[in-house]
């Protein structure tokens, strides 16, 4: 798990970019600290291939990419939560989390709190499962209105175009 954690922290750097409120140099130093701590340069880290970069290659559209990135960011937040008591790497994780927070959640504390709540929901709890199934229709409806709205607007524009040319 230690090698995997380190490798994931390294991938985070490439996934989310290198700029941020702490600057490139600071961000790179913190990634290097994590690499050293987890011995991520060891050849056995590469066994089995990368965790996320191959998956990300399949997601070309920017809005689609956000979907998979949200799952990856969720993973990193869980990883950092599991390592929160490790004082040796705490500062590095805090800086990386802050940069991730700025890039992925646009610095919104409310979004961060909601995101944390979501990743903490236990999926093996029967009451949670029942609530989730109860809300499934609403969630599915929330997922689809944008595409229906676009189709409706496109249809209206086509209809208007026909009326104008008649």
UniProtKB/Swiss-Prot annotation:
Glycans are attached at residues 39, 106. Its main location: secreted. The modification Pyrrolidone carboxylic acid is found at residue 24. This is Interferon gamma. Homodimer. Interacts with IFNGR1 (via extracellular domain); this interaction promotes IFNGR1 dimerization. It holds the Pfam family IFN-gamma. InterPro entries: 4_helix_cytokine-like_core, Interferon_gamma.
């Amino acid at each position: 798990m230690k090698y995997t954690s380190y490798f994931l922290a390294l991938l985070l750097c490439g996934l989310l970019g290198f700029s941020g409120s702490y600057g490139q140099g600071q961000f790179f130093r913190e990634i290097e600290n994590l690499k050293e701590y987890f011995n991520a340069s060891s050849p056995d880290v590469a066994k089995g291939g990368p965790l996320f970069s191959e998956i990300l290659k399949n997601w070309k559209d920017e809005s689609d990419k956000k979907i998979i990135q949200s799952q990856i960011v969720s993973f990193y937040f869980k990883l950092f939560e599991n390592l929160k008591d490790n004082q040796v790497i705490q500062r590095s994780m805090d800086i990386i989390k802050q940069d991730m927070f700025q890039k992925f959640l646009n610095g919104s504390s409310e979004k961060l709190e909601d995101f944390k709540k979501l990743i903490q929901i236990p999926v093996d709890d029967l009451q949670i499962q029942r609530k989730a199934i109860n809300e499934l229709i609403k969630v599915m409806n929330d997922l689809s209105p944008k595409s229906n709205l676009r189709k409706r607007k496109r249809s209206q524009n086509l209809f208007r175009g026909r009326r104008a040319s008649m």
